[in-house]
Every structure is written in C-alpha cells, then in structure tokens.
C-alpha cells in the first residue's frame, strides 16, 4: 500500500 494515500486512525487501524 502507498503510505502517501494511507493514513492511520487514532484507533490504530489503517484506512485507505
């Protein structure tokens, strides 16, 4: 997955 198009929620789960 491209880290530039992915962000981490405060819960710790990664979403596109």
UniProtKB/Swiss-Prot annotation:
Major subcellular site: secreted
Subcellular location: Secreted; Secreted, Cell wall
GO cellular component, one term: extracellular region
Keywords: Cell wall, Disulfide bond, Secreted
Domain of life: Eukaryota
Family indicated by similarity: Belongs to the thaumatin family.
This protein's name: Thaumatin-like protein 1
UniProt source species: Taxus baccata (English yew)
